[in-house]
């Protein structure tokens, strides 16, 4: 055994506390050496162990009779969608790497989440991304945004996976801490799914497959578990470098090996590299491993055991073939031009042994390293931030109401604003057509993709209003769940399951931990009420700079299922017949906490829109029921920018005119700014054929929901809005020009 010992100072340098260093000595019965310290520091980092979040995450609802792989059981969540098929999905962050090296940081985030999906035997069919950056008027923010988007596009396009949707929110709070959350959805056959476990197969050989191992990404896991500082920007060696063409080969080879049933288990090498893959597979299978690092194919000469174990070089897998199938496995990977090298053996005693140059470099119980095993678990001190009691005192009635003649320009300004304008400059860089699975155009509320070989479809969405969760963490998180579910329901699909990416500040600061805890509580309560299992996800703490934490952002990734994609809904009606429009649900708009308030007054304050989980569920149930009965021709969720922005988006997307009369709504909402631009929950604009109006009304009113007549389609290419004391009209072209102008200049 390597004799070199390490000190408490070394442990602290690796991000471990004194208590944790003492615990490691108890586990080993001795002081660890440098290789062992490196392994523990990576595996016990926040990024790998979830040590400050796991006890909170265990309060989330995870049960469903459709669940095939739940939270923490495998690399991603999996749910049964019938016909022997499963939808496999997960979301993960790559925030810190993107802040330092945006192109590679964002690209490798896409690569990592793709591997989580295809290691389970699922072929990825679509990806999404949820992005947060500072105001691109500042050169550094523009650089981070444009380079990250290019990294996402280049990697995904090279893999041949269509982008099905996503979101972008720009705000000064994210200036030094961008958030890049990547989600991938795949489809697998039940009998061709793989596991990340040794399954107790003692004596089986362990192989490393894919790319070579280099020095890139060393300390990546611990790097993602610290606040960002000026020094962080110089830690580019902690950012991995991706090769999407290598990943494409690795995906095809892995899926072929899984389909031919050659494997006992397969695990992606992501955070903490070989350290994580060997320990997690061993612990899950209640075994150990004996690994010889001299056999690992290296990209760079003279790498020591510490570097090899902690390298996060991309496009690598650890696989355990069935006995007697080793030759066939190697042949498949060689056929695809990839390494496939035996590096060890599964052992019975539960110990992870690492050797190099004939010397034992590490000897650690595998269980002691992993989440759910010996990795530490904490609940931190909580303290309610004082600002939460201040922001609710804001009185929107003290803001002067809009005059009718200022509304047209206000709509134009909002349509061209950073958070509402067209995302075309982003999705033009993404391949949205590859694979022939996309059903709806980019820019819809939710993405809808066809499951190859079937009539079924998967609806996908990512959502979170970071301003809401900043102003009210508990209810803001509930709204994030409901908004994501509404976007899936707007396609006509039934919300099915949730994956989450929780982006917060330093958990050791009590105010930050309170906000995190409240968001988790809100997320759990909303999912329980809506009957949605949380299948897994990711926690990213330390999104904080010397100026403070980012707005808390619990990003919700939602999947839904529709029985026939041909019957899916769009934002706009596709029929050539005349249609009528109505506003349905629980319309209670407020300018508090709204995008309108921020753009017009520069304020992030006030009570967020009222949330009623009962009304949300009733509204979505009625909408889906109407879709199933063929009563609707379109559906558009109300969100940022309120009613007029939603109407403008309908006109822009459908390139058809709409005539609206707001007289009925004016009696309910007398303030013009709230009526036109206030934000609300549980509300959709739906369209239908005139003959179906009675049935549509009954579907919603029978559940105690409101139905307000808005107007009808028009032969004129314009949006016409009348009411008591006003008549506004915008041509479709003028709306489109404003909508397309917001982000365009930053990407030219």
From Swiss-Prot:
Subunit note: Monomer. Part of the FGAM synthase complex composed of 1 PurL, 1 PurQ and 2 PurS subunits.
The protein, known as: Phosphoribosylformylglycinamidine synthase subunit PurL
EC number: 6.3.5.3
SUPFAM superfamilies for this protein: PurM C-terminal domain-like (SSF56042), PurM N-terminal domain-like (SSF55326)
Family stated for the protein in its record: Belongs to the FGAMS family.
Organism, scientific name: Leptospira biflexa serovar Patoc (strain Patoc 1 / ATCC 23582 / Paris)
Keywords in alphabetical order: ATP-binding, Cytoplasm, Ligase, Magnesium, Metal-binding, Nucleotide-binding, Purine biosynthesis
Gene that this polypeptide is encoded by: purL
Binding site for ATP: 50, 90, 500, 537
Residues binding Mg(2+) 2: 116, 268
Main location class: cytoplasm
Catalytic activity: N(2)-formyl-N(1)-(5-phospho-beta-D-ribosyl)glycinamide + L-glutamine + ATP + H2O = 2-formamido-N(1)-(5-O-phospho-beta-D-ribosyl)acetamidine + L-glutamate + ADP + phosphate + H(+)
Keyword Heme part of the UniProt annotation: no
Recorded metabolic or biological pathway in which this protein acts: Purine metabolism; IMP biosynthesis via de novo pathway; 5-amino-1-(5-phospho-D-ribosyl)imidazole from N(2)-formyl-N(1)-(5-phospho-D-ribosyl)glycinamide: step 1/2
Residues reported to bind Mg(2+) 1: 92, 538
Annotated GO CC locations: cytoplasm
Catalytic residues identified in the record: 47, 94 (proton acceptor)
Binding residue positions for substrate: 93-96, 115, 240, 312-314, 540
Function statement: Part of the phosphoribosylformylglycinamidine synthase complex involved in the purines biosynthetic pathway. Catalyzes the ATP-dependent conversion of formylglycinamide ribonucleotide (FGAR) and glutamine to yield formylglycinamidine ribonucleotide (FGAM) and glutamate. The FGAM synthase complex is composed of three subunits. PurQ produces an ammonia molecule by converting glutamine to glutamate. PurL transfers the ammonia molecule to FGAR to form FGAM in an ATP-dependent manner.
GO biological process: 'de novo' IMP biosynthetic process
NCBIfam families for the chain: FGAM_synth_II, PRK01213.1
HAMAP family per record: PurL_2 (MF_00420)
Keyword presence, Cytoplasm: yes
UniProt-annotated location(s): Cytoplasm
Molecular function in Gene Ontology: ATP binding; magnesium ion binding; phosphoribosylformylglycinamidine synthase activity
């Amino acid at each position: 055994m390597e004799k070199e010992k390490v000190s408490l100072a070394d442990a602290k340098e690796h991000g471990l506390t004194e208590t944790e260093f003492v615990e490691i000595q108890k586990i080993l019965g001795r002081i660890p050496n440098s290789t062992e310290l490196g392994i523990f520091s990576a595996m016990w980092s926040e990024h790998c162990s979830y040590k400050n979040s796991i006890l909170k995450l265990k309060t989330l609802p995870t049960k469903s009779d459709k669940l095939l792989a739940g939270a923490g059981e495998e690399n991603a969540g999996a749910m049964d969608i019938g016909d022997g098929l499963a939808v496999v999905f997960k979301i993960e962050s790559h925030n810190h790497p993107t802040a330092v090296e945006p192109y590679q940081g964002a690209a490798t985030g896409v690569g990592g989440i793709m591997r989580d999906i295809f290691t389970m035997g699922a072929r990825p069919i679509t990806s999404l991304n949820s992005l947060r950056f500072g105001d691109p008027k500042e050169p550094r923010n523009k650089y981070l945004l444009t380079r990250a988007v290019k990294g996402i596009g280049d990697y995904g396009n090279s893999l041949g996976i269509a982008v099905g949707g996503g979101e972008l929110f720009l705000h000064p709070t994210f200036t030094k801490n961008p958030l890049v959350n990547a989600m991938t959805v795949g489809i697998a056959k039940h009998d061709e799914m793989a596991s990340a476990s040794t399954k107790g197969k003692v004596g089986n050989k362990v192989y490393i497959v894919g790319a070579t191992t280099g020095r890139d990404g060393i300390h990546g896991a611990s790097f993602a578990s610290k606040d960002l500082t000026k020094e962080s920007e110089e830690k580019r060696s902690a950012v991995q470098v991706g090769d999407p063409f290598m990943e494409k080969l690795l995906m095809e080879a892995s899926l072929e090996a899984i389909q031919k049933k050659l494997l006992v288990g397969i695990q992606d090498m992501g955070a903490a590299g070989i350290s994580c893959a060997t320990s997690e597979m061993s612990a899950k299978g209640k075994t150990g491993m004996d690994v010889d690092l001299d056999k690992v194919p290296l990209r760079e000469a003279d790498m020591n055991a510490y570097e090899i174990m902690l390298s996060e070089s991309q496009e690598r897998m650890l696989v355990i073939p069935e006995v007697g199938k080793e030759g066939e496995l190697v042949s498949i990977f060689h056929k695809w031009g990839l390494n496939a090298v035996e590096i060890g053996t599964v052992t019975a005693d539960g110990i992870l042994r690492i050797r190099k140059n004939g010397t034992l470099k590490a000897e650690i119980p595998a269980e002691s390293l992993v989440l759910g095993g010996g990795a530490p678990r904490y609940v931190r001190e909580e303290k309610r931030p004082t600002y939460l009691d201040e922001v609710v005192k804001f009185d929107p009635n003290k803001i002067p109401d809009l005059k009718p003649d200022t509304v047209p320009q206000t709509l134009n300004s909002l349509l061209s604003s950073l958070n509402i304008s067209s995302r075309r400059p982003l999705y033009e860089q993404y391949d949205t057509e590859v694979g022939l699975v996309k059903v709806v155009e980019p820019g819809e509320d939710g993405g809808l993709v066809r499951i190859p070989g079937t009539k079924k479809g998967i609806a996908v969405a990512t959502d979170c209003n970071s301003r809401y969760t900043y102003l009210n963490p508990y209810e803001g998180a509930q709204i994030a769940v409901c908004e994501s579910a509404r976007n899936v329901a707007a396609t006509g699909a039934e919300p099915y399951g949730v994956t989450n990416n929780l982006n917060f500040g330093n958990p050791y600061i009590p105010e930050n931990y309170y906000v995190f805890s409240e968001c988790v509580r809100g997320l759990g309560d909303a999912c329980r009420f809506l009957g949605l299992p949380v299948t897994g996800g990711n926690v990213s703490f330390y999104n904080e700079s010397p100026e403070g934490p980012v707005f808390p952002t619990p990003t919700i990734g939602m999947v839904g299922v529709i029985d026939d994609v041909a019957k899916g809904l769009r934002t706009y009606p596709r029929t050539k017949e005349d249609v009528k429009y109505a506003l349905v649900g629980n319309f209670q708009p407020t300018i508090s906490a709204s995008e309108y308030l921020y753009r017009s007054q520069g304020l992030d304050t006030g009570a967020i829109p009222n949330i009623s989980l009962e009304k949300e569920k009733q509204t979505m149930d009625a909408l889906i029921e109407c879709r199933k009965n063929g009563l609707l021709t379109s559906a558009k969720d109300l969100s940022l920018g309120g009613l007029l922005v939603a109407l403008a988006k309908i006109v822009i997307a459908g390139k058809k005119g709409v005539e609206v009369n707001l007289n009925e709504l004016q009696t309910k909402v007398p303030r013009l700014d709230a009526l036109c631009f206030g934000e609300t929950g549980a509300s959709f604009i739906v369209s239908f054929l005139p003959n179906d109006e009675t049935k549509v009304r009954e579907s919603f009113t029978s559940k105690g929901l409101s139905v307000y007549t808005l107007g009808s389609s028009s032969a004129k290419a314009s949006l016409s809005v009348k009411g008591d004391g006003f008549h506004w009209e915008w041509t479709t072209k003028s709306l489109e020009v404003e909508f397309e102008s917001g982000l365009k200049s930053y990407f030219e």
